[in-house]
Regions:
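Aromatic-lined carbohydrate-recognition surfaces of secreted/lumenal glycan-active proteins
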Residues: 1, 22-26, 41-84, 101-107, ...
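Elongated scaffolding segments in large macromolecular assemblies
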Residues: 71, 82, 93-107, 112-129, ...
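Substrate-binding cleft of secreted/luminal carbohydrate-active enzymes
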Residues: 103-111, 131-203
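Alpha-helical scaffolding segments of alpha/beta enzyme cores, especially the outer helices
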Residues: 7, 36-47, 90, 116-123, ...
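Short, small-residue-biased leader/transition segments that mark boundaries at the very start
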Residues: 2-9
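Alpha-helix N-cap and loop-to-helix initiation/capping positions
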Residues: 1, 32-37, 76-87, 112-113, ...
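A short acidic (Asp/Glu
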Residues: 32-35, 66-69, 114-115, 144-147, ...
Length: 203
């Protein structure tokens, strides 16, 4: 409920770390009343907080958009690049001014398709004045075990494709399980080490 946002801001809004809002409803297509939901909730969050930025993190209805309860790792009925562009053009037109940042999840399409979707997403976001970030998933959708930490080379590839498409900001899902040294997955700590080594090469 929207009123919950007002209650949260009254209790927590004075903290310096309260820098904005994440609207947690995820979608991949222009279905139902998703535009109305994003627009109304985004405007309400900004209204009660003095204009703090709002973010959404949708996904792409690609071949890897498979339920975690399904042993399969891919599907056949997927969105085309053209349909994706058309539907998200309409969504962005409807949420302009209510949503400030869009961070598409990067794990639902094949690696050789990803850069094209990244470029389309950024082109549309630029058109409507939204910031376009990438949400780089740190778990592996290519394995029948749902889910294990992603191999470093795959994560590095996705980050490189985002940079190639002109992205400057990234978030991840999900650090605590798949990348934290404190995770129960031993691979997560190794992924963290590889990432920190990579950051040192940028200094």
């Amino acid at each position: 409920r929207a009123s919950a946002a007002s209650d949260v801001y009254k209790r927590q809004g004075h903290y310096k770390s309260f820098a904005g809002w994440y609207i947690s409803q995820e979608c991949s297509r222009n279905t139902g009343k998703i535009v109305d939901l994003y627009a109304s909730l985004g405007r309400y969050c900004k209204e009660v907080s003095g204009g703090l930025p709002t973010m959404i993190s949708p996904y792409i209805d690609g071949s890897k958009n498979v339920s975690q309860y399904n042993a399969s790792t891919s599907k056949q009925n997927v969105v085309t690049l053209e349909s994706h562009e058309r539907e998200w053009d309409a969504i962005f037109a409807g949420i302009k001014g209510a949503v400030d940042i869009v961070a598409f999840q990067d794990g639902h399409v094949e690696y050789d398709e990803l850069v094209d979707f990244l470029k389309v997403n950024k082109k549309l976001a630029d058109r409507y004045g939204l910031e376009c970030w990438t949400n780089s998933e740190t778990f592996d959708r290519d394995m029948p075990i749902k889910f294990l930490p992603i191999k470093w080379e795959k994560l590095r590839l996705k980050m490189g494709l985002a940079a190639q498409a002109g992205y400057q900001n990234a978030i991840t899902f999900e650090f605590s399980h798949f990348m934290s040294p404190q995770s129960a997955y031993l691979q997560a700590g190794h992924l963290y080490d590889r990432y920190m080594e990579y950051l040192k090469t940028l200094e």
